[in-house]
Amino acid sequence: EVAPVQPGQRARAGTAPTARTRPGRSVVLSCCLVSLVAVGLLIHAGLTGKQRPARQPRVHLSGKDLTGYAPHTVHFNYDVSEVEADTVFIGVDGPSVPLDKKKHTFSYFYGLPSLYRTRIIAHNRTLSTLQVLVKSRGWEANLDNNYELSPHVAFEKDKGRLYITPESIKPLVTTKDKIFWTGYRNVQDFDADGDNFTLETRIKSNAEEGGIRCFDTEIEVIGTRANCRITLVEPGCSNFIRLDISDVHKSGRTDDLSSFAQDYSGWGRVKVRVCDKKAEIFFENKLIHRLSYQEPIGAIKGITFWFKGVGSVDYVRLYNAQNQPVYEDDFEKPESAATVSRFAGE
């Protein structure tokens, strides 16, 4: 006996035919239906198999004088005419800039030495990339308070360290809260692999010599593919620590990085050792952190130091994968020191 179909319900497959339906006709209809479904599935499978992903628009990006010394201007050549987007951007240094799709030339001024990764962007996707290496002539320095600096502020040259006296930059500090950062950078081809190197240095920051509370200090190795950056602070300030090594990013707010809170009001020795994408950080010869990462850092192109307020660097030593020195500087010679860059916010 067949249960009646309730209003709004569909008959279940396999229910017996009613008395007004001839069995022969039902079988024929069922066979036809099965055949049509099978054909439909085959057609769908064929169409699906032939579908190809949307074609990536052809984008051209090249440049003239992609390597030079700061200050430096690069002239980019581009073609984004095939990109289906209302606005196409070029990311240089800082906020992305919209491109004129009808034109093919864009120039940009780089005030500070660094390795810059230029990108063509549309719909929040990177369509093309290009690197610009702006080198320094030895060590250069700048003060970061988002203002252009005077080119006449010099380092101390007779104490064997990188150091700017607070008095020499006091007229340049224009932020209302008097919070500023000083930085030292050396950008060049260091002939070392960012995934196999050792960096040794000695740093100092304290209130008496111009450091600002927590004495945040950043040490960064710049690679062609990614960067390696560590932060040190005084004890009690670990909330402000950042650790960025290639694709690994940690914050003192969400990770326990208290081992990076150290006393370097006198001199503190720091060593960063990377071997086969495994990084170890030492303070005063004691291992304070280790991690592994996946994405390569690439060839080393720069070393930078940033101090909250003013800080000192006693020496810098860089070794390659064979533990051979590829760069050393103890800042005993006057020519090791340099003047403050005029362009702190570029």
List each language-model region with its residue ranges.
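Carbohydrate-binding surfaces in secreted/extracellular proteins
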Residues: T201, D263-Q294
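Extracellular Ig-like/FN3 beta-sandwich strand-entry sites
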Residues: P113-R117, G194-N196, S265-W267
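Short, aromatic/His-centered strand-loop micro-motif at the edge of beta-sheets
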Residues: S246-R269
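Flexible glycan-contacting loops in extracellular carbohydrate-active proteins
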Residues: L291-L318
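Secretory/extracellular carbohydrate-interaction modules
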Residues: G138-A141, S168-D247
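Extracellular/lumenal mature domains of secreted and surface-exposed proteins
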Residues: R12-S168
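Extracellular beta-strand elements of beta-rich domains used
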Residues: T201, V272, D314-L318, F331
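Cytosolic/nucleoplasmic/matrix-facing N-terminal domains/tails
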Residues: E1-Q9
